[in-house]
Amino acid sequence: MFEINPVNNRIQDLTERSDVLRGYLCYDAKKERLEEVNAELEQPDVWNEPERAQALGKERSSLEAVVDTLDQMKQGLEDVSGLLELAVEADDEETFNEAVAELDALEEKLAQLEFRRMFSGEYDSADCYLDIQAGSGGTEAQDWASMLERMYLRWAESRGFKTEIIEESEGEVAGIKSVTIKISGDYAYGWLRTETGVHRLVRKSPFDSGGRRHTSFSSAFVYPEVDDDIDIEINPADLRIDVYRASGAGGQHVNRTESAVRITHIPTGIVTQCQNDRSQHKNKDQAMKQMKAKLYELEMQKKNAEKQAMEDNKSDIGWGSQIRSYVLDDSRIKDLRTGVETRNTQAVLDGSLDQFIEASLKAGL
């Protein structure tokens, strides 16, 4: 005879958790908005404005992730209760096991939705930019920056996010001096925002003929893409705009016109640049979009002392603002904020970052 009380208790628990999420995630409002978005997307002229149509499509996906999951939870829990009744009446262990398996799947789905509660920031659902900057230390630090770039690109790929290299500065011997990556996908900024900080590498350097141990630093800075309708005033007199020739690996010119654009916001010292298009006009638009996003992030940080302190330390790539230590000799990677640690260093460098990211989000960092 199978034990039914623990299963009924689980159903009750999942029902209560689901009801809490319905309130917290504004289920009714989202369901109503989903109907509105679907109606707009069914209009024959919706693609006359491609950018708006794409934005509506993205919004629909985000709304469906909440509405459909909660609908499936409600129906699924009713179905499991029905299966349990059948199992008890027929004394059928196979039906009972089927009900338990369905309950396990529902619990996993609910846990994923509960995790999204941590993405409550205004721009958590937005696409984002990731800046990686090599610290002092020459080739070793530049190679480390390149390893971080690969790690984040692999991580983004594993989550189905789209990535685009906006600007990249090659290292003199190996690696990169800096790179800006645009990462697009559902809650891209929410997922990555706690990765801002300094990453420390300790290893026997392949660039040292003596095979000595070296410590290198590189920084990551994550900021959301800001909607064009956000009111951020930028005084043109505060900007210095430089154009230059875009160059690729090995110094080869991508083209012979000065299409690359660098914009400096003089009061803050913030710099953005773009060279990924042959059109100077498009590169300037992209660099301005990044500038707007960075200035928005700066304003948000001024309202938050902890984030502001991190921004103040951003230029000082050293011991003070470290978030994670990668000690390859000892096969150990440790997050200095949450204490999460792993010895599978290669998996992490290949993009397996979720254990660190999830722990930092759950800790409210």
Curated annotation (Swiss-Prot):
UniProt name for this protein: Peptide chain release factor 2
Organism field: Escherichia coli O9:H4 (strain HS)
Modified residues (N5-methylglutamine): Q252
Free-text description of this protein's post-translational modifications in UniProt: Methylated by PrmC. Methylation increases the termination efficiency of RF2.
Cell compartment(s), UniProt: Cytoplasm
Gene name of this polypeptide: prfB
One Pfam family in the UniProt entry: PCRF
Entry-linked InterPro entries: PCRF, Pep_chain_release_fac_I, Pep_chain_release_fac_I_sf, PrfB
Function statement: Peptide chain release factor 2 directs the termination of translation in response to the peptide chain termination codons UGA and UAA.
Domain of life where this protein originates: Bacteria
Similarity comment text for this entry: Belongs to the prokaryotic/mitochondrial release factor family.
Keywords: Cytoplasm, Methylation, Protein biosynthesis
SUPFAM superfamilies on file: Release factor
A GO molecular function held by the record: translation release factor activity, codon specific
Gene Ontology, cellular component aspect: cytoplasm
